[in-house]
From Swiss-Prot:
<dbReference type="GO" id="GO:0006426">
    <property type="term" value="P:glycyl-tRNA aminoacylation"/>
</dbReference>
<dbReference type="InterPro" id="IPR004154">
    <property type="entry name" value="Anticodon-bd"/>
</dbReference>
<keyword id="KW-0030">Aminoacyl-tRNA synthetase</keyword>
<keyword id="KW-0067">ATP-binding</keyword>
<keyword id="KW-0436">Ligase</keyword>
<comment type="similarity">
    <text>Belongs to the class-II aminoacyl-tRNA synthetase family.</text>
</comment>
<feature type="binding site">
    <location>
        <begin position="185"/>
        <end position="190"/>
    </location>
    <ligand>
        <name>ATP</name>
    </ligand>
</feature>
<dbReference type="GO" id="GO:0005524">
    <property type="term" value="F:ATP binding"/>
</dbReference>
<comment type="subunit">
    <text>Homodimer.</text>
</comment>
<dbReference type="InterPro" id="IPR002314">
    <property type="entry name" value="aa-tRNA-synt_IIb"/>
</dbReference>
<feature type="binding site">
    <location>
        <begin position="259"/>
        <end position="260"/>
    </location>
    <ligand>
        <name>ATP</name>
    </ligand>
</feature>
<dbReference type="Pfam" id="PF00587">
    <property type="entry name" value="tRNA-synt_2b"/>
</dbReference>
<feature type="binding site">
    <location>
        <position position="94"/>
    </location>
    <ligand>
        <name>substrate</name>
    </ligand>
</feature>
<feature type="binding site">
    <location>
        <begin position="190"/>
        <end position="194"/>
    </location>
    <ligand>
        <name>substrate</name>
    </ligand>
</feature>
<feature type="binding site">
    <location>
        <begin position="304"/>
        <end position="308"/>
    </location>
    <ligand>
        <name>substrate</name>
    </ligand>
</feature>
<feature type="binding site">
    <location>
        <begin position="175"/>
        <end position="177"/>
    </location>
    <ligand>
        <name>ATP</name>
    </ligand>
</feature>
<dbReference type="InterPro" id="IPR033731">
    <property type="entry name" value="GlyRS-like_core"/>
</dbReference>
Length: 462
């Protein structure tokens, strides 16, 4: 994990928040590369969920909601973790992460005596208005799903969708975690990508299995190494109070396999609870003429897909990070590689760090590099870049030797480098260098955009 953290700080992916004041523990800011990567992941998810399905629409619900939403959902009374404190060093731990989580047990930090277990509510509270009275108490949402449930009827009435249909949302959530650790894996402020799919009660198992397959295929599509992922099915005693079934997609992070995304069959729990406590009718009347009158009116069941956007950023960085040794023969701009563990590679080559991100996710798609900063090559390179910048995320780099510039682009995952040289002035061609293989192609300036689109469309990670 140290290498990932170092790369993120060095190349502008993630910074400690409020760093000039010493930083705020467990809170992070996303730099130029980080926000671009995060936005690209969110865009890919949004397209996969909404554009590729006729029956899924989007929503952006408020962070601050009526407190009764959280009372009804059970968060006010039950959204808590077991907590123990050390009576000596005052450290706090989740009870399930301590060897002896009971009063008098040893503190894993200093060996002092621990307190007994108590429940710690994970919701942040705030107040709306000029007073701090209980009547003005609000909560920062701990999840985005409830905003979808309370808008279910609004969406149904304004879109004329029919069951089965889904509502997708990307947004921030907040949890007052007892322990924040493992970089951006577990933080107090994070972003979720969730979709709630409303189905007939008799079809919940079918759609649960369908969305399990769809979500696995998403990560496969964007080049994640499948041998680093696995499914974990929740046993009956692990299921949340609302769930009929649950499966997690886990990824092999540096600290071990951890949850990346969950798919849950929530049954009709959420809509039924909100109907009871709000007094509103949230039943659906199915227009299918093949159903009898009694079966046509029901509360839909919900199949949920819930992914952490910030965890996805970390996962894609970990999965893409590669170290390899580069051998440079005496051929202009040519490079060959040996894997980092190949015998003799470290003695004879230079190590490069490369992020093998899918081109659709990379913060920069193509970098334009004039061979030298004279003879009009800089202006020509800028002109070629300007022809493509509306369609691709472009960078321009004229500082330093060409090999150093390649390395900088490798480290941030740029899949294509376009070198403009003296031949470019003669025949209007450029050299396109491919990140993963370091192979080079001479491409006509007129066909450069089409070449890049084709490479992106047919990209396969080596």
């Amino acid at each position: 994990m140290e290498k990932i953290v170092g790369l993120c700080k060095r190349r502008g992916f993630v910074f400690p928040s409020s760093e000039i004041y010493g930083g705020q523990g467990g809170v992070w800011d996303y730099g130029p590369m980080g926000i671009a990567l995060k936005n690209n992941i969110a865009h890919a998810w949004w397209q996969d969920m909404t554009r590729l399905h006729d029956h899924i629409v989007g929503l952006d619900a408020a962070i601050l909601m009526h407190p009764n939403v959280w009372r009804t959902s059970g968060h006010v009374d039950h959204f808590s973790d077991p907590l123990v404190d050390c009576t000596v060093c005052k450290s706090r731990f989740r009870a399930d992460q301590v060897a002896v989580p009971s009063a008098g047990g040893p503190c894993p930090q200093c060996g002092g005596a621990l307190t007994g277990v108590r429940n710690f509510n994970l919701m942040f509270s705030t107040h709306m208005g000029p007073t701090d009275e209980r009547a003005s108490l609000l909560y920062l949402r701990p999840e985005t799903a409830q905003g979808i449930y309370v808008n279910y009827k609004n969406v149904l009435q304004t879109t004329r969708l029919k069951v089965p249909f889904g509502i997708a949302q990307i947004g921030k959530a907040f949890r007052n975690e007892i322990v924040t650790k493992n970089f951006i894996f577990r933080t107090c402020e994070f972003e979720q990508m969730e979709m709630q799919f409303f189905v007939r009660p008799a079809e919940d198992t079918h759609w649960f299995e369908y969305w399990c397959a769809q979500r696995w295929a998403f990560y496969q599509k964007y080049g994640v190494r499948m041998n680093h992922m696995r499914w974990r099915t929740h046993a009956a005693h692990e299921l949340a109070h609302y769930a009929r079934a649950a499966c997690d997609i886990e990824y092999a992070f540096p600290m071990g396999f951890r949850e990346l995304e969950g798919v849950h069959n929530r049954g009709d729990f959420d809509l039924t609870r909100h109907a009871q406590h709000s007094g509103k009718d949230l039943c659906y009347v199915d227009p299918d003429p093949n159903l009898d009158a009694a079966a046509r009116r029901y509360v839909p069941c919900v199949v949920e897909t819930s992914a952490g956007l910030t965890r996805c950023v970390l996962m894609f960085l970990c999965d893409a990070y590669t170290e390899e040794y580069v051998q440079a023969p005496n051929v202009a701009f040519s490079e060959t590689t040996q894997t980092a563990d190949q015998e003799g590679a470290a003695r004879t080559g230079e190590m490069r760090i490369v992020l093998r991100l899918h081109p659709a996710l990379s913060p920069t798609t193509v970098a334009f590099l004039p061979l030298v900063k004279k003879d009009g090559l800089v202006d020509l390179a800028r002109a070629v870049r300007d022809e493509l910048r509306e369609d691709f995320a472009c960078d321009f780099d004229a500082a330093g030797a060409i090999g150093k510039r390649y390395r900088r682009q490798d480290e941030v995952g740029t899949p294509f480098c376009v070198t403009v040289d003296y031949q470019s002035k003669e025949d209007d061609t450029v050299t396109v260098r491919l990140r993963d293989s370091m192979a080079q192609r001479r491409v006509s300036r007129a066909f450069l955009a089409e070449f890049l689109r084709t490479e992106i469309k047919h990209y396969r990670r080596p």
